[in-house]
Regions:
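Conserved mid-domain beta->alpha element of the FAD-binding
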Residues: 9-24, 28-35, 157-158, 184, ...
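Residues at the starts of beta-strands that form the adenosine-phosphate
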Residues: 5, 28, 222-225
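FAD/FMN-dependent oxidoreductases across multiple families
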Residues: 196-197, 208-210, 218-222, 227-304, ...
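Conserved N-terminal helical subregion
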Residues: 2-6, 23, 48-189, 232-251, ...
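C-terminal auxiliary extensions adjacent to catalytic cores
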Residues: 372-388
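Flavin-dependent oxidoreductases
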Residues: 182-216, 237-238
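Short beta-strand micro-motifs enriched in acidic
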Residues: 137-138, 215-217
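Catalytic P-loop NTPase motifs of RecA-like helicase/translocase cores
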Residues: 38-39, 165-166, 299-301
């Protein structure tokens, strides 16, 4: 297909990756972002080989290898005893097997790499402060209205997250569902930790009704911590509730001493508990010249560490479909057909992992027995994928 003018709503990981993929295929892109400036929020993010391949293809490998950490292995531990339930090599083993590294890095570092690459790309414009309120698709063009003006393109991609205004325009308003789980997220300076107790691995501690994951980010300067607990309801008006480290210690009061030492080493003025929400699977992702990408169409729980990876895969596949297709609606339909079964699998597998991580006796013995087999099977299905 000849060079297109594509509008992308949302300057997150998925939207910016898609812009770079499109530019490298010769298309012109305008990214509309509601925030008045680039914001590099969030703590750690895991980039598995299936996503790394895409980021390498758009020229980010030098920055990734400089800013990111490659975990040596993945370890699952018993919440109270610290005994190893399962161990899987990552590092060089994953790179050799799947053709690309497994990276841990700060979300802000990944966003900086994407933003810097876009700043050097003459085919991409990013408009900050462009809060989209509506869109209209015609036969030959799509018109997007923001509070500050109107934009026109041939294709519209909603990469605007779980609260997507583009999804709402396509399918009507759908309220997100509280999953019955909440997460503490915070960073701990590694300088305050005993290096012997915390190796460069991604470690998940499994306990009844809750789990704790930690891994190194920020070129080894920080330990990213994510602690998930079950909750019967979320009564707060906001999705985010402020708290203190003492609250986290209370939630994990009977856990292994080394894990509690990790929590106690946190040196943060603010800590927040996040409610985990998802949405029902969508009947379709688009119509005509309009489609969705990432959390806008398949919001995913964090229990497979594949949320960012799915958006990155979407970005590459959608760019390829638009470049190879004969017409825009057909290209977008092909993209949806290629992606929907995989993202649905990841959504459902992530939900299942929440149950697995939080299993209670007597089911824990069965979980621990089948985890090595099931883990290898899942790893192959996820990391073997090639979106390019």
């Amino acid at each position: 297909m000849k060079a297109l003018k594509v509008l992308i709503v949302g300057a997150g990981i998925g939207g910016l990756t898609h812009a770079l993929c499109l530019s490298r295929a010769g298309h012109r892109v305008t990214v509309l972002e509601a925030n008045p400036r680039a914001e590099f929020l969030g703590a750690g993010v895991q980039i598995s080989p299936n996503a790394t391949k895409v980021l390498q293809a758009i020229g980010l490998e030098p920055g990734l290898s400089q800013r990111a950490t490659q975990p040596e292995n993945s370890i699952f531990r018993h919440w109270r005893t610290g005994a190893t339930i399962h161990y899987a090599p990552l590092g060089s083993a994953v790179k050799e097997r799947f053709g690309a590294p497994y990276y841990h890095l700060l979300r802000s570092d990944l966003m900086a790499l994407l933003t810097n690459a876009i700043a050097k790309d003459s085919r991409i414009d990013v408009v900050y402060g462009a809060k989209v309120v509506a869109f209209e698709a015609g036969d030959d063009a799509v018109f997007v209205d923001s509070l500050d003006g109107q934009f026109m393109g041939q294709v519209l991609v909603g990469a605007d997250g779980i609260h997507s205004i583009i999804r709402q325009g396509l399918l009507g308003e759908q309220l997100p569902r509280f999953t019955g789980q909440v997460a503490w997220r915070f960073l701990v300076p590694t300088a305050s930790l005993d290096a012997r107790a915390f190796s460069p691995a991604v470690t998940a501690w499994w306990g009844p009704g809750q789990h704790f994951v930690h891994y190194v980010v920020g070129q080894g300067q920080w330990m990213n911590c994510v602690c998930v607990l079950e909750a019967s309801q979320w009564a707060e008006e906001s999705w985010v509730q402020p708290g203190e480290i003492t609250d986290v210690l209370a939630d994990f009061r009977d856990w292994h001493p080394s894990l509690r030492a990790l929590i106690e080493a946190a040196d943060v003025p603010d800590i927040y508990k996040w409610a985990l929400f998802d949405r029902p699977e969508l009947p379709r992702w688009g119509a005509g010249p309009v489609t969705l990408l990432g959390d806008a169409c398949h919001a995913t729980l964090p229990f497979l560490a594949q949320g960012a990876a799915m958006a990155i895969e979407d970005a590459a596949v959608l760019s390829r479909c638009l470049s190879e297709g004969a017409d825009i609606p057909g290209s977008l339909k092909r993209y949806e057909d290629l992606r929907k079964s995989r993202t649905t699998y990841v959504q459902r597998a992530s939900q299942r992992n929440g149950w697995v991580y939080h299993a209670r006796p007597p089911l824990t013995w069965l979980r621990d027995l089948i985890t090595p087999w099931a883990g290898q099977r899942t790893m192959t299905r996820l990391y073997d994928y090639n979106a390019l």
